[in-house]
Amino acid sequence: LMFFKLIHRSSKSNARAGKIFTDRGVIRTPIFMPVGTLGTVKGVHQKELNDNIKAQIILSNTYHLFLRPGIDVLLDSGGIHKFINWNKPILTDSGGYQVFSLSNNFKIKQEGVYFSSHIDGSKHLFSPESVIKTQNIIGSDICMVLDECLPYPCDYSYAKTSLNLTHNWLDRSIIEFNKKNKAYDYNQFLFPIVQGGTFKDLREKSAEYVSEKQMAGNAIGGLSVGEPKEIIYNNVDIVCNILPMDRPRYLMGVGTPENILECISLGVDMFDCVMPSRNGRNGMLFTSEGSINIKNKKWERDFSPIDSKLGYMSSYYSKACLLYTSPSPRD
């Protein structure tokens, strides 16, 4: 079963073009995945996401879906695709990052992560096995292993201990995944995650360990928690020079246009980030000429389009129109 085909490699950088094959469609890479935390991308209708934005795949979050609507509802609905009426591929992250960033309190143990829901305080355990089972019920096309996402900065001793735990969790995740307890009749693919903080030897060790597993694709985690861009690029370069050429590489959570273009040149194929939708809701827009704050008063009589180079929606509304129709604190 072919999952990834490398179509072209740049002669000027490590950029490449390829295709990912899933039961729900082909994904052309490099690809940016809009984030739909609960399945749907905030502020965007599914038809617009498909027809205008032309999203080939979206990302949903295991932590949030586990808490609401819950796996029983998703199972009864026939999985996330039917629940949100989306017939293209979906990737789910493991939920580990959200446990560490959103939970009121959490404890990392060998067996997994104990945490309290940020919604109602209820207590739960995410183990490598339970996270695979949950994503199986969610029904995503690509699922992720549970890992520990380190803060930045982080000392070497803790990063080394954490990496050993993450690798142990990876092995357990693969064992559970290989049981093939599919909830639905289509293929699901598992990506391991390279961690190691910002330490070259740990990143190399993790990239080598992950590569040995020969999974369908590989992810690079822990580089969207506040690191300077030079550190991001350096670590991505280190990892991409080790990960196998014939598997897609997914850089988790990194999503400014500048970051994406630079990391494509380093050999990354897949990206996700909440930034486009979150920033858009708050008036910050990415254009082909840089980012603009549409709530700035200087746009109040600017009747030119947001960006005439970026398709229908960007050329349809003027800057002045968006300034006056954007939500403000008093609305």
Residues covered by each model-derived region:
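Conserved small/polar residues in nucleotide/adenosyl-binding loops
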Residues: 324-331
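Non-catalytic, usually N-terminal nucleic-acid engagement modules in DNA/RNA processing proteins
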Residues: 2-184, 292, 296-300
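Cys/His-rich short segments
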Residues: 307-315
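Glycine-rich phosphate/ribose-binding loops and adjacent secondary-structure elements
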Residues: 176, 180, 188-306
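Hydrophobic alpha-helical segments that mediate membrane insertion or helix-helix packing
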Residues: 93, 135, 210, 262-263, ...
